[in-house]
Amino acid sequence: MARTETLVKLVAAALLGLALPAHAQDAEPAAEFWAAREATIEGLESAARVRLGIWDSGVEPALFPGQVALGADGAPIVRGYDAFKQRQDTALAVLPAALLERRAELNDILRALDDRDSGVDSPQARAIAERLRQQTPAEAAGFDDALGRWSGYVHGTGIADIALAGNPHAEIVIARMEWWHGSPPQPCWTRGLAAREAASVADLLGFLVDNGVRVVNMSWGRAERAYLSNLKACAPDMPEEERLALARYTVETIRAALIEGMKAAPRVLFVGAAGNAGSDMKTANPATLFALPNFLLVGAVDRHGRATEWTNTGPEVTLYANGDRVPARLPDGGPSFPSGTSMAVPLVVNAAAKVLAVQPQLDGAGLRTLLERTATRNGTGQPLLHPQRAVEAARQIPAN
């Protein structure tokens, strides 16, 4: 999410740089460029439900009546882990009451930062810029901590809102995870936490597959630099080579868990975020840096389909979508317009779900291939998602 530079040091590091400015040039939340590519799936009243996995920071189920998968007990299908990688099966993170009481204020701040960081000269953007300039170091630390936790808390709800838009045939299963917070960060990273993190990743992936999910939204990456930032802040006396070794061990362990789980689920398409560090994927080294037929890495362009300075790139990134002020509701139902590769991913997931509503027999690799084949290239060569062409191509596939 392109919220504020302060979040780069906090939540964004753990979210693979999901807080870099989007550099938008105008204030509209959507452009005609992308609207002309939208897909509709009318006339499919008898279509089977398509289950989507929202593997993120949690989702507010009340915002999506009839589109949250329910278990035999009638409750939303949810599995979650807290920041210490312990099971906590709640749809949203459990936050301190004092922070929840500030929800209206924090939501307003997020919207103001959406404006400021995407170049929208609104009164709210000017006010938040002035507030940040006037903060003392102590005030800035408290602001960063509160906003970092809140930004993570709302992230998954916005992802779900984008993924479900315009598709009454889709429903979500919620896989929730949390990241560290505070300064110094809690928890401070250890080899034991790395093992628990990998185990939780394997468990959540299996949980989604076991519950019939066909497309999984992964707007995260677990980049090496995130763990290095954590250790630098909370373990300053640890030798640099030890910090690097622990960070790489964590990334490699999570990567192995992801590869094993995805290989065992060929019917599922997994969609990951390239990240917003403005680097190549090998330099960023996220845990999602690998190639499988049913795994797709997504980069971001702006609302006019143009290249951005901040998306990660490389041959591993085979599809791009809008990551510029994408409309996404907050847990209270209010609007926001975040930016980043986090927001590009659910647009691809949305298109994939519409394709599956038309052609449910496609497996993960076939779905990925169709999305890539129907993309069109912009002036700088990035292949851009084209949901309308993808759905039309799916309609032409003969039924088995």
Whereabouts are the PLM-identified features?
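Sec-dependent signal peptide recognition
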Residues: R3-A13
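C-terminal subdomain of the subtilisin-like protease fold in secreted/lumenal serine endopeptidases
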Residues: N217, Q359-N400
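Substrate-binding/access-modulating region of protease and related hydrolase catalytic domains
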Residues: W180-T288, G334-S339, M343-V345
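Structural recognition of the beta-strand scaffold that forms the well-ordered cores
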Residues: R51-I54, E171-R176, R214-S219, L269-A273, ...
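Subtilisin-like serine protease catalytic core
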Residues: R37-R196, L292-N294, H304-R306, N312-E316, ...
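Extracellular S/T/G-rich loop segment that most often corresponds to the catalytic His/Ser-adjacent loop
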Residues: A273, A284-A357, Q361
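Catalytic metal-binding/acid-base residues of hydrolase active sites
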Residues: G58-E60, G221-A223, G275-G278, D302-H304, ...
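N-terminal signal peptide c-region/cleavage motif recognized by signal peptidases
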Residues: A19-P21
